[in-house]
Structures are given as C-alpha cells and as structure tokens.
UniProtKB/Swiss-Prot annotation:
CDD domains: lipocalin_heme-bd-THAP4-like. This is Peroxynitrite isomerase 1. It is an enzyme of class 5 (isomerase). Heme b binds at residues 157, 184. A motif (GXWXGXG) lies at residues 40-46. InterPro entries: Calycin (IPR012674), Nb(III)_bact/plant (IPR022939), Nitrobindin (IPR045165), THAP4-like_heme-bd (IPR014878).
Length: 194
C-alpha cells in the first residue's frame, strides 16, 4: 500500500525532484546507503515530557532525497488531547542528514553522521553520531544556537531505529537544568509512503 505513495512534487523545476520513495525519482546517493531505511513518510504517535508535565502527540516525519549526498528531514508534530484528538500545533523541525569525515578523527571509523536541524521554536542544533546497526542510529548534540526569541533548551541525545513490523521508533533525551539527560520525546511511526 505504501509502495505507490510519494510526496507531492512540481515537475517544472530543472532539477531532480525530492522523493520519499526509493522506487521513484533519483537514485539514492551511494554515500547514504547506511541511512536508506529512513527514507519515507512516517506517521504515528508519541509521548513527550515538558515543563507542564507529560503529553501525547501525533507526528509526521518526511525523509526525502534528490540524489544529492544528503537526506532532507522534515518533522511536524501536534499535541493530542485525552481522547487522542488534535489539540494544537507542536514541535516542528527541518534539516539535513549526511555523512562527513569523523570530527573526532576516530581511527576505527572514518565517517560520522551529521544532522543539522532548525527548530520552529527558535534554535538550531548540530548532531553527530554513528549507525549502531544496519537499522539504528545514535546522535548527540555537538552545538546549539538560540535566536533572541528562541526557547532555552539543553543539548540532546537521539536514538532512531527500524523496529519489529518495519516501524520507525525513536527516543530523545535532553539535558535538564541540572546537566543530566532526562527523557523528553519518544514515538513509534508507521511507514505512510515509500
């Protein structure tokens, strides 16, 4: 059912269209093969912890490419009420995944994952990490910049993985005021397209 779906495109641009379906469009760049399972449109629900307590949210993540040496990332979420219905817009982020020369110069690994994200809440985050397996990836914040109007946040650690049933699951921990990592977000998303 998801194999025929893709993201909408306009065919009047003189460059390859973005695709979230590996069966359509440009071939995935060879440098991104370790991230291939992420490509697609993912939808589902998760749980978050904020300053006003725990909450549930819905989410869509679009991971697409145009044949370049990076993946496009767009995540949109919305708060859910106690009945699981839409309540209000939630977190939104957009960015790029790519492989780069290892910033740590680790002799056992020559490449690191770089994830650059801009958040609608007014901050930009740079993560570095590695594949843990063929279908799981761990990333940690390396740098964070906040706009004048942006929310104050600490760094984060994210773990993504393709789990039983082919779903995408992730957990994010954020640094709290005491300097420790605490649970912040987790979700399980099913493939909607790709």
């Amino acid at each position: 059912m998801t194999a025929a779906r893709n993201i909408p495109t306009f065919d009047d641009l003189p460059l390859p269209a973005d695709t979230a379906n590996l069966r359509h469009g440009a071939n995935l760049h060879d440098a991104l093969l370790a991230l291939l399972p992420l490509v697609g449109v993912w939808r589902g629900e998760g749980e978050g912890r904020g300053p006003h307590g725990d909450y549930r949210f819905g989410q869509q993540i679009v991971v697409s490419h145009d044949g370049g040496d990076y993946l496009n990332w767009e995540a949109r979420s919305w708060r859910l009420d106690e009945d699981g219905q839409y309540e209000e817009p939630g977190l939104r982020e957009t960015g790029f995944w790519r492989f780069v020369s290892d910033p740590e110069d680790d002799p056992s690994e020559s490449q690191a994952i770089e994830l650059l994200l801009a958040h609608s809440a007014g901050y930009v985050e740079l993560f570095y990490g590695r594949p843990l397996t063929q279908s799981s990836w761990e990333l940690v914040t390396d740098a964070l910049a906040r706009s004048r109007s942006g929310v104050l946040v600490g760094g984060a650690k994210r773990l993504y993985g393709i789990i039983e049933g082919g779903d995408l699951a992730y957990v994010e921990e954020r640094v709290d005021a005491d300097g420790g990592l605490v649970p912040h977000l987790s979700a399980r998303l099913s493939r909607y397209a790709g």
